[in-house]
Amino acid sequence: MICSTPKDESRIHQNTLLRSLQRGFTLTEVMTVIAVVGVLLAIIIPSLKSLSDQAAGATELAAARQLSQGYVGYATDTNGELMPGYLSQSPGDEHYEGNYDVQGPDGNLLGGPAKRRWTWRILPYLDDAVDSLFVNEARQYIDQRRGTDGFAYLTSVFPSFGLNGEWIGGMQGSIYGDLHTLGRFTGQCYYAQRLAEVQRPADQLLFGSSRGGGPQGDSDVEGFFFIQSPYYLTTGWRWAEDEDGGPLYEEPLAPSKSGYLSLRIRGKSATSMLDGSTALRSMQELADMRLWTNQAWKPDWVLDLQNP
């Protein structure tokens, strides 16, 4: 009988291991691994997306709150006067653009539409941080245009949030200034001009996640300086309608048919109220006129010029 030596046993073990490695995995083993990996990915990927959505939502809500605080800070500095969403081009008006000095990105004084929009006028109440106007996807859009000739203009048009300027502060010289124009004909003002006029600041919508049509026919941009209420001043519903004339909330909708609101956070818009509170709201929730103006006493409220 020949006894194996330790060296022989080591060689046998190595040969066995080598043959095992050369053999590789069986089809059953490979399929099992693939199935396990698939299950793990099915669990992990939605979780990662959910975490990403939650982070984006938290970022938007924080930015919306900061904007509301800046807006109220302006009102505090002006003895309760609310910041106009758009300045007038008529010298006789109280909020004539010539009465304002508005600094641009390099400290230079702005003129034209970039000056008239609220965007650059609120920056002194946000520590002059242009970046505070842009979050998530909108930050990428504006970062690509820094240092260009059109930066100040594009910044004024496409902040991440739109102001409810039709009912708060007014849109005097804007194409969205129908409510102001109506008041000039009737001799009344239908939008809030001062903090004291807003009786329920916690119910008064100020800013919302927005989107607008891109410049020169480009695709829509996540951001716009203005958001628009669902009902027109006196005639009723003005957002998108279905075939039967009822409200249509299904995306995608043109910005002008959805109040320039963006539902980019899990199908909702990040909103802030005049008191600084914030919430994610759906289109159905934002279709309630009681959020847009304290004058409204029902969801489908419109101005009644016969019984003011």
Please place each PLM-identified region on the residue numbering.
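Short, well-structured segments within or immediately adjacent to enzyme catalytic domains
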Residues: 60-308
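Residue-level signal for well-ordered alpha-helical scaffold segments within enzymatic catalytic domains
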Residues: 4, 42, 46, 50, ...
